[in-house]
């Protein structure tokens, strides 16, 4: 495991260097005390992972994510409705390749009367109870904001329960305008325009996340292979023992 941590740390340092060379602004790059969190761009082949993550949320976390008491059927229907071609969905995986936190950036395109396009986005996030307090929501929000800038979205809308203080704090810190309506609060953030630096940053962060995931996947497969070898050895030893008797 020490070797794996060394490989991941080396990969992180190289990615930091590439981000600096690309001139990525500080608001898109963690400071020296932060961990560069690998955030994967989820695809259709991750549907089972997404559903497993959402179903593992407790009742309170489901309430914070969806704004209502969602049962398993609601979650299943939500997962089926995901549009991977239109929207962007991100996930943070642990070493067992299970999603700890995920974000959904829904992209909306509206055609104005003058035939121009107006692009907006809506942000939703969920975090498993175990890693809470590690800043994963903030990291996911930064990643979503990066893509929203590159996708030429003008605004990001966040619907959050008024009791969801951490999410509202992140939105307020980013400069969003908050409007409370009873138990819900709507946060509207004007998105700065993207540029070459943000586009390069998105390419590098995606590559870092993909490489990190591949390392974790290889390690998991390697340990599974070792377990299989151990099982075979036990079977051979047991067979020899029976033959000797």
Language model: regions and residue ranges:
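Structured alpha-helical
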Residues: 98-100, 151, 170
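A short, internal acetyl-CoA/4′-phosphopantetheine-binding micro-motif in the GNAT/acyltransferase core
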Residues: 122-133, 161
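A short beta-loop-alpha structural element at the N-terminal edge
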Residues: 37-52
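A short gly/proline-enriched turn/hairpin at secondary-structure junctions
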Residues: 61-67
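Basic nucleic-acid-binding interfaces
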Residues: 108, 137, 176, 180
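Terminal substrate-recognition subdomain of acyl/acetyltransferases
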Residues: 1-37, 160, 166-245
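Conserved acetyl-CoA-binding loop-helix of GNAT-fold acetyltransferases
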Residues: 127, 133-148, 155, 169-173
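Acetyl-CoA-dependent GNAT
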Residues: 67-118, 124, 128
